[in-house]
Swiss-Prot record:
GO terms for molecular function: acyltransferase activity, transferring groups other than amino-acyl groups. It catalyses: 5-hydroxyanthranilate + (E)-4-coumaroyl-CoA = avenanthramide A + CoA; 5-hydroxyanthranilate + (E)-caffeoyl-CoA = avenanthramide C + CoA. Involved in the biosynthesis of avenanthramide phytoalexins, which are phenolic alkaloids found mainly in oats. Catalyzes the N-acylation of 5-hydroxyanthranilate with 4-coumaroyl-CoA or caffeoyl-CoA as acyl donors, forming avenanthramide A and avenanthramide C, respectively. Does not accept feruloyl-CoA as a substrate. It is an enzyme of class 2 (transferase). The gene is HHT4. GO terms for biological process: defense response. Transmembrane segments: none annotated. PANTHER family: SHIKIMATE O-HYDROXYCINNAMOYLTRANSFERASE, TRICHOTHECENE 3-O-ACETYLTRANSFERASE. Its EC number is 2.3.1.302. It comes from Avena sativa (Oat). This is Hydroxycinnamoyl-CoA:5-hydroxyanthranilate N-hydroxycinnamoyltransferase HHT4. Belongs to the plant acyltransferase family.
């Protein structure tokens, strides 16, 4: 699909403020160093969709969006800055007000429907501006945006947000606040911009082992050669799978019931199903250790809770670890392992994690990447509780929002339905051979 860029603008905050440097917590520094990609799709409202009079007027007017963006960057001023290093080499944010990239593009030969179920393939990634990382860390904007207009009248909004600046909750806080301003509303919750609340204790006193920061298990030497060979040589595939409300209900029906039966969250049950299917698709031996990475928002796990609107990264990681034979059996067995790891994520555990990171000589060594999630391991990040469908710029809510790409084999996302029908979707990257088997297994509930 041909995409033509019509205009690129660096949008600066609508009002200047004194330049400052923003200290990053340890949680801001152990995240991947690229821009997190996501894409929104919007259909042009019409009478048939039940839209009110004038709903399509000025549909995604670029000038209106730029003005609102400049206004949003005033309270969210770190977003308009650049990365920098302090005298010790620690990455921080230079709140320089240099602006964010806003691109207008057209895809005259494409329609929203051409993207099918919105699997995060390379076609979706083309809807987000590419970032040149070849220069110094101060050389690129922290936020890149692209509005692409399709022949059907629909629009996509591609977002690339540098992960040191914000996690999913904070990133959506910004995007949704921008959309509120564009719609003529006010920002509901102002950002809280002070990351020192997540400083480690002095002196740091970690009280747990923190397996989440230990190296991921490797394939056992006794495993089949197809699994122990160089993983970088295996082609990967990306796909998305929908589980309906009734299918999710059938998953729950597999759990024990009655007095004294364990209680599992929806995430634990679904994650157990995905972990089981991935392990079976990969053909893992029963004795093979496998680790599941579960991103966990610490905003309300910390006590006292962080202020509403805290802007930054507050993602801790629960990491259930088990032998494959444990997770390829009954769903309840895997769910018990997962729920146990999630239940351990208390204030005490999270504070200990901050202290543990403070004691590490090189935080960059703990940044997760391809080596973390590849076979035999898995990352499963849930966006179910995030307000991913709230970005109404004045022309209606998105019909889809999800990742604009999946960087690593073995990484997956859980997405809620835009129409609130109770279904959940799994976007995942696996080795192509394993994906064929996973496709059959995931639907077998």
């Amino acid at each position: 699909m041909a995409i033509t860029v019509r205009r690129s603008t660096m949008v600066r905050p609508a009002a200047e403020r004194p330049r400052e440097r923003l200290w990053n917590s340890n949680l801001d520094l152990v995240v991947p160093r690229f821009h997190t990609p996501s894409v929104y799709f919007y259909r042009r409202p019409d009478a048939g969709a039940g839209a009110g009079p004038g709903a399509a007027e000025g549909f995604f007017d670029a000038e209106r969006m730029r003005r609102a963006l400049a206004e949003a960057l005033v309270p969210f001023y770190p977003m308009a800055g650049r990365l920098a290093r302090d005298e010790d080499g620690r990455v921080e944010i230079d709140c320089s007000g240099e602006g964010v990239l806003f691109v207008e593009a057209r895809a005259p030969g494409a329609a929203v429907d051409d993207y099918g179920d919105f699997a995060p393939t390379m076609e979706l990634k083309r809807l987000i501006p590419a970032v040149d990382y070849s220069g110094d860390i101060s050389s690129f904007p922290l936020l890149v945006l692209q509005v692409t207009y399709f022949k059907c009248g629909g629009v996509s909004l591609g977002v690339g947000m540098q992960h040191h600046v914000a996690d999913g909750m904070s990133g959506l806080h910004f995007i949704n606040s921008w959309s509120d301003l564009c719609r003529g509303a006010q920002i509901a919750v102002m950002p809280f911009i002070d990351r020192t609340l997540l400083r480690a204790r002095d002196p740091p006193t970690p009280s747990y082992t923190h397996v989440e920061y230990q190296p991921a298990p490797a394939m056992l030497s006794s495993a089949p050669q197809a699994l122990t060979g160089k993983p970088t040589l295996a082609p990967t595939a990306v796909d998305i799978f929908k589980l309906t409300r009734s299918e999710l209900g059938r998953l729950r029906a597999q759990l024990p019931t009655g007095e004294g039966a364990p209680r599992f969250s929806t995430y634990a049950v679904l994650a157990a199903h995905v972990w089981r299917c991935v392990s079976l698709a990969r053909g893992l031996p029963a004795e093979q250790p496998t680790k599941l990475y579960c991103a966990t928002d610490g905003r309300h796990r910390l006590q006292p809770p962080l202020p509403e609107g805290y802007f930054g990264n507050v993602i801790f990681t629960a990491t259930p670890l088990a032998e494959a034979g444990k997770v390829t059996g009954a769903v309840a067995d895997g769910a018990a392992v997962i729920q146990g790891a999630l239940d351990r994520m208390s204030d005490d555990y999270c504070r200990s994690a901050l202290d543990y990171l403070e004691t590490q000589p090189d935080l960059s060594a703990l940044v997760r990447g391809a080596h973390t999630f590849r076979c035999p391991n898995l990352g499963l990040t849930s966006w179910v509780r995030l307000p991913i469908h709230d970005a109404d710029f004045g022309w209606g809510r998105p019909v889809f929002m999800g990742p604009g790409g999946i960087a690593y084999e073995g990484l997956a996302f859980v997405l809620p339905s835009a129409n609130k029908d109770g279904s959940l979707s799994i976007a995942i990257s696996l080795q192509a051979e394993h994906m064929e088997k996973f496709r059959k297994l995931i639907a077998d509930v």
